[in-house]
From Swiss-Prot:
This is Putative phosphoenolpyruvate synthase regulatory protein. Bifunctional serine/threonine kinase and phosphorylase involved in the regulation of the phosphoenolpyruvate synthase (PEPS) by catalyzing its phosphorylation/dephosphorylation. ADP binds at G149, V150, S151, R152, S153, G154, K155, T156. One of its GO terms (molecular function) is phosphotransferase activity, phosphate group as acceptor. Its EC number is 2.7.11.33, 2.7.4.28. It holds the Pfam family Kinase-PPPase. It catalyses: [pyruvate, water dikinase] + ADP = [pyruvate, water dikinase]-phosphate + AMP + H(+); [pyruvate, water dikinase]-phosphate + phosphate + H(+) = [pyruvate, water dikinase] + diphosphate.
Amino acid sequence: MRTAFYISDGTAITAEVFGHALLSLFPVSFNHNTIPFVETEEQAHKVLQQISESFQDTGERPLVFYTIVNVDVRKIISKSVGINYNFLDQFVAPLEKVLGVPSKPEKHRTHSIHETTYDIRIEAVNYALANDDGSNLKDYDEADIILTGVSRSGKTPTSLYLALQYGIKAANYPFTEEDMGDMLKLPPTLRRYKHKLFGLTIAADRLHQIRSERRANSKYASIQQCRMELREVENLYRKEKIPFLNSTKYSIEEISAKILAETGLKRRKY
């Protein structure tokens, strides 16, 4: 199996994002190897050795995605036996021409602790943790969005991703079996914040699978219970005109992006 390397003199997040985005277009499996903080020539030569060993082991030239500011380190990596993709060289020079301004690369700037949005994102993460699963209703005034849905429909990971990636304060509220009764109704606590609500739903068989991993052979995980709860929440969404999304086939990243697109919430990442 071919190996893909993601290399940087910073966190390597940018190299990973670009590289994964490109590789996801192809129905091919890869071994992934991320190497951050390659800041010296000595470290760069060690990375070259890893790339060479991968080539020797697999017989296939590795794919090498890298974003390296240090010119000397970058030159060393560019000599690897792999197929090299230097994102900075490919994109910076054309941008300099268009903008009429030379770039001023700085290590760690992209994902630095010094970026102005760092405190905003950390505050949003703390908010998401404090307002998980309807645990702190008194803070809903601060929420940018309140995700609702049945247990295990993706509310918590989506809330945390929105916070960490975009600085959005996302609370989440679960609808449980006790809420169902004869017919699920919007709780008075939520009605006041109806304009902030966004619903998540999921296919019953997928919910059954997820819950069974947590509590096998329980009523909570039974397909009948899953179908009943999902039917009730989807009826509520339609009745109350709450926008909602079926999360079954989407990653957390995709769910979050779709929520932002539908609600118009502004990212606080940059």
